[in-house]
Regions:
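Short, acidic/hydrophobic/Gly-rich beta-strand patch recurrent on exposed beta strands
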Residues: 23, 236, 273
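Inter-motif core of Ras-like GTPase G domains
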Residues: 285-309
């Protein structure tokens, strides 16, 4: 299905709006449109990038007044002749126009099929095609900036540059194989090592950016933890500015992890309100605490809450569970309004989740943990899990090649390791190694039908 030349059609806008857009693409796109469109001139005679007013007609009956935008190959999104029909947003009108188009020779597009055609026509590389879905799904300024940069090319040029350098190294090594009987060394081993180390550093820098990129794309996970009844759910409600979570004086009320998303200055944070941590014989509460520990493990930021009364009673200030080295920790002392004279231990933040004291300061601190400056200064940031896995595999292959270089690995085996690096780096964009149909289907199944 991916490589056929059918003319395809699909709605490009969500249902429910005042207006709708229907997209059609393929060799017969304009001829098919002419069978149902009545305007001043045939669309087949129209130039690209022109808009035409007319009517959609069904067996002589006017269905709707529309505008049709014409795109000519190869200067269209898909690289094919294409048109976009702008009509009124009635679901009946949209479904009728699609029925007329399919009856006239088009077929309904599958998920992401327009973008598949753009990729196969060389209009986009794979990473740019994936960014189309990301930009549609973006829910914050930072996530939009990340997806928009990738859609404009992102690190595609840098990766292709790496592939070219690696191909040069491989060519020199394989030239040695052609002259193996003469024992000629075309690739100076010291220079080869230096070049491979530079490439490895570039790959590692891209890999290391994934933590930030994925957090921006998916939302920064923040686990709200602490003993029962310290005000965790009240804090989440205060951050949301609504009574989203049930609050009770009864210890152990929260038994499941509750997730809510909050946009703080252009970055989405995923707050995980967790069950209070304590020793208990209650089986359901124990299960909730186990889920709390799982939430802590996957969080980028951990908020550990206590309160003034517990501090006065000698409760520990620091959490008693382990944290990863890359996790940020915030210790909050809640209910400071009930004990204004209670001294705050060093490194803690005093708040009152009930009346809002210290909440804006908490928001600023959370936002400061996410450095998005790189997004707006052209730094390459990886946010796609497939790209991260490909770069990890490339880095592993390059390290094997470096180890082999140091141990005197045979030239043909060394060349093969470098070719593995090229394969994995090239799989990110798909330009240096054409992706399989299974990979394409997996990637484009995440796109909406009209894209």
């Amino acid at each position: 299905m991916i490589r056929d030349h059918d003319t395809i059609a699909a709605p490009a806008t969500a249902a429910g709006g005042a207006l709708a857009v229907i997209r059609i693409s393929g060799e017969e796109a304009l001829r098919i449109c002419d069978r149902i469109f009545r305007g001043r001139e045939p669309l087949t005679a129209a130039a690209g990038y022109t808009v035409h007013y007319g009517e959609i007609v069904d067996d002589g009956r006017v269905l709707d007044d529309v505008l049709v935008t014409v795109f000519r190959a190869p200067r269209s999104y898909t690289g094919e002749d294409a048109a976009e029909i702008s009509c009124h947003g009635s679901q009946y009108i949209v479904s009728e126009i699609l029925r007329l188009l399919t009856a006239s020779g088009a077929r309904m597009a599958g998920p992401g099929e327009f973008t598949i055609r753009a990729y196969l026509a060389g209009k986009l590389d794979l990473s740019q095609a994936e960014a189309v879905a990301d930009i549609i799904a973006s829910s914050s300024r930072a996530a939009h900036a990340l997806a928009a940069d990738l859609m404009r090319g992102g690190y595609s040029d840098a990766l292709e540059g790496l592939c070219e350098k690696l191909l040069e190294l491989t060519a020199l090594l394989e030239l040695e194989l052609d002259f193996s009987e003469e024992e000629v060394e075309f690739a100076d081993r010291a220079q080869l090592r230096e070049a491979m180390q530079r490439i490895g550093a570039h790959i590692d820098a891209l890999r290391n950016s994934f933590t930030l990129g994925n957090a921006i794309k998916e939302g920064v996970a923040v686990a709200i933890t602490g003993a029962p009844n310290v005000g965790k759910s009240t804090l989440l409600n205060r951050l949301l500015n609504e009574e989203r979570v049930l609050v009770s004086d009864i210890a152990g009320t929260t038994r499941d992890v509750i997730e809510e998303r909050i946009n703080i200055d252009g970055v989405v944070f995923r707050f995980l309100d967790t069950a209070g941590i304590r020793a208990t014989d209650d089986r359901l509460e124990q299960m909730g605490i186990q889920r709390t520990m799982s939430s802590i493990e996957r969080a980028q930021i951990v908020i550990y809450m206590t309160d003034a009364a517990r501090l006065a009673a000698g409760a520990p200030v620091a959490p008693e569970f382990p944290l990863r080295a890359d996790q940020k920790l915030l210790v909050l002392v809640n209910k400071t309004d009930t004990a204004p004279d209670c001294p705050l231990p060093e490194g803690t933040i005093g708040i009152s989740a009930r009346n809002g004291d210290g909440i804006e300061s908490l928001r600023r601190i959370l936002r400061s943990f996410v450095d998005t400056e790189a997004l707006y200064h052209g730094d390459a940031i990886v946010s796609n899990n497939r790209h991260y896995e490909a770069l990890t595999a490339a880095g592993d292959a390059l390290r094997r090649a470096l180890d082999g270089l140091g141990s005197g690995l045979q030239t043909d085996l060394l060349s093969e390791e470098i070719r593995q690096v090229i394969h994995h780096v090239g799989s990110v964009t798909g330009r240096n190694s054409l992706a399989s149909e299974e990979v394409l289907k997996h990637i484009f199944s995440k796109h909406c039908v009209g894209k």
